[in-house]
Amino acid sequence: DDLTAELIAAAAGVPLVLHPDAEQHVRRWCGERSIEPNDANLKQAWLPEGAELIDNPVGSAVGFALDIAGTLVLTTPGVPSELRAMLPAVCARVTHKLGGGELYRLRLQTFGIGESTAQALIDDDKTHWPDDVVLGFRAGMPQLEIKLTASADTPDVQRCRQTLERLFGDHILGEDDTTLAGAVQAVLRNQGKKLVTAESCTGGLIASMMTAEAGASSVFEAGFVTYANDIKQSVLGVSEATLETDGAVSEAVVVQMLRGALQRSHADIGIAVSGIAGPGGGTDDKPVGTVWLAWGSADDLHTWHTVLPTDRRMFQQLVAAAGLDLVRRQLLGLPRLPHYFSRRAI
């Protein structure tokens, strides 16, 4: 039911025509999936007369470019994954239209620092930023992307890059599309080590984040999701007495969970978490949002406790992210952050 092509054709005062390359693209896409193309599929091949096709490498609907009275109009499908795949071609057309060269772009992925703090660090720094350098931020759970764009790669621009690396230091995970889990993977791979997880309140989210990254099999050993207390005992060897005395959300239990996971795998380092995700289950001593984490190796084990008063889904995401960063920092010999998302840390 997309009306984009029709409306742009009307604005340009030209008819819609069956674009042969677009038709071939639609038929090939359908054929690869054993689909007989119908009218709805083939409608995607009808473009404004004079339009130039923009290939879609992942979907059936192509994009197109059309000059309307000196204005370049570019269209893409609305599906985010398809848009991302087509952006290089779209940007190339815009650059060509404007007659400019290739822009210099730097995207630094950071963790553990907020946008306002990042801006304050930059504002307080005495570095001179060239006029053609544009800085920006894109906040996304759980990372902050710091973007630097300039008209060209010059020595001044490289000095700006070095300034960002100095200001944000060990908060930097990597460049471009590096994720927190991807950064952990890279360190594990460089050190020839493997990770094991033992999760209760996060329900396997840490393992899921790790295995969502390509190449996980070389660095991820196993993941134990031990939600119920009896499974903590039978699978990981957590003591019944410890559970009764300290409770499932306690330092003693996550330590035993971690030791059990390490003993039952060939992993070099592990992370264990147990908490109260809510909305119920909290007490005066252990309110909703309480979480204990244990991480490290058998002979170098650490624990940490915090309270994250938020909704259940966000709680799980925050705990998983904090756990991965704790592993990353231990592997790199870095101190843990003083707090993760909350200042109610102990």
Question: What are these regions, as identified by a protein language model?
Answer:
Residues 1-15, 164-177:
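Flexible gly/pro-rich beta->alpha loop and the following alpha-helix that scaffold active-site loops
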Residues 2, 16, 20, 41, ...:
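Electropositive phosphate-/nucleotide-binding environments in soluble metabolic enzymes
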Residues 2-98:
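Proline/glycine-rich low-complexity loops and linkers
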Residues 13, 42, 48-50, 60-61, ...:
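Short coil/turn connectors at secondary-structure junctions
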Residues 27, 155-346:
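Short alpha-helical segments enriched in small residues
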Residues 37, 97-102, 217-221:
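Short, structured loop/turn "capping" segments at alpha-beta junctions
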Residues 62-66, 146, 290-296:
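Short beta-strand scaffold segments in enzyme catalytic cores
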Residues 67-142, 149-157:
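Accessory alpha-helical/coil subdomains and C-terminal extensions
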